């Protein structure tokens, strides 16, 4: 069974096992602001998503990560859909994310309907 919930303090070890870019302080901020999610498969945490507000007004997915052992099973798609629904329920009409030019993730986001909007 799949469950998606907001990140909680007890997720710290799992979170930092996947996300090497977030500071401890920012993790605590994600917990308190409810701007991070954990996906569990049969009660095992397997994926995460964190976001912030770009220009203080547009939800921006900073990180989507599914444990390599669980990739290509639809978990990333489910986690993105959950985030998109939550953001739309809060009244946001536009969502953003970003990848590097050579990342395989570009194909994933395009399949979800995301469009290229620029590069530097």
Region locations from a protein language model:
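Acetyl-CoA-dependent GNAT
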Residues: 2, 6-63, 67, 80, ...
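A short, internal acetyl-CoA/4′-phosphopantetheine-binding micro-motif in the GNAT/acyltransferase core
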Residues: 64-71, 100
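Conserved acetyl-CoA pyrophosphate-binding loop and the N-cap/start of the following alpha-helix
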Residues: 70, 74-82
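Conserved GNAT acetyl-CoA-binding A-motif
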Residues: 87-100
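Conserved catalytic-core motifs of GNAT/GCN5-like acyltransferases
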Residues: 96-98, 115-120
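Helix-turn-helix
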Residues: 105
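Conserved active-site tyrosine of GNAT-family acetyltransferases
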Residues: 109-110, 114
